[in-house]
Amino acid sequence: MLPAGSISSAYRKPHTGWQHRAVLNGGMTYNKYRTRARATTRRIRRITLGAGLLVVIAAVAAAPGFQSLASSTIHVLRSEHHDALGEALPSTVWPAQGQAAVQVGESQVQAGPNQHPAPIASVAKVMTAYLVLRDHPLGPDEDGPTITLTDADVADTDHRRGRQESVVSIAAGEQLTERQALQALLLPSANNIAAVLARWDAASVDRFVGRMNAAAQSLGMTHTRYTDPSGYDDPTVSTAADQVLLVDRAMRLPVFASIVATSSVTLPVAGTVRNTDGLLGHNGFVGVKTGSTDAAGGCFAFRAIRWIGGKHTTIAGVVLGQPGHDLVAAGLAAADAMVDRIASPARARAMPVLQP
């Protein structure tokens, strides 16, 4: 696993600075493009239509065949408009293995191949945090109510530690604020705190899991099934496309966005804990959540902000099932490479492309 705030040299990209000269595809400068377009417009304006021709056009337009053709033409124009502002991603964008999906700016979610329900590991904690904040909203400067940890919580933590799960140290009688519990959940990815939050929110883990599944259905996550609040259980499955829908919704919550953008925090008993997101602060990445198990592979739900088409553009995405010796690093590397390919200036068709 990468240390917090670091990233292996295998996938660290140098910062090249902002680019400044507008060039369209094919090497035509933006100014030359505008000059040619204006000349074409002037020629069109000189064309006049006779009254007889207008009558013919009106008659043809009324014909059923023409109406069908017009409908098809409108569809093509809309497709081209969408293509220019948020074009369909080429197959080279997606990771070679596993599955992935992204949403670029305000466009629709686009999914790569192999979209089938699969284990998502700790990416499931995004839903856990989303539900807790939905049920117990926090203001930007609020820490929220306190949660007192019990002997049962300590016993559960010891059991999970024995299974090599990701946990943070706790003590009976320790008090965590809601914000601190969410930080423990999302930064070091503490499975024991996922269970604590589930019981605090819904009185039992099973009831909380039921709420997770109800929320998934309400968000249109039709290929998602949660069986635990941490994602450690393999039967917790989803698709990358489903999880992108959740990332978008969760990042609308300022407290969630603030927590996942934090590199480390200090907890009462655990001390300093660090974010497992080694891409945080690099190449425009601003969060969200890593995950890894043998069954799930390397997983990463993320948001990045990159310079595309002459403006800062948000890229929200998820990669699942990435193979490698270090599964967390594999998920991070796949996301980093995918965002780089999406943000490549060569892909900004029909827009001024910024180049040095």
Each model region followed by its residue ranges:
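Intrinsically disordered, low-complexity segments enriched in serine/proline and basic residues
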Residues: 1-4, 18
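Terminal targeting segments of Actinobacterial cell-envelope proteins
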Residues: 11-47, 350-353
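Penicillin-recognizing serine hydrolase domain
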Residues: 29, 41-109, 116, 204-356
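Active-site SXXK
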Residues: 120-147, 243
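Alpha-helical scaffold elements that line and support the substrate/ligand-binding pocket
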Residues: 125-128, 181, 185-202, 206-208, ...
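Short glycine/serine- and small hydrophobic-enriched flexible loop segments
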Residues: 130-138, 199-202, 248-249, 340
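Short, well-structured active-site flanking segments
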Residues: 134-153, 254-262
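Conserved catalytic neighborhood of penicillin-recognizing serine enzymes
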Residues: 155-194, 272-288, 292, 307
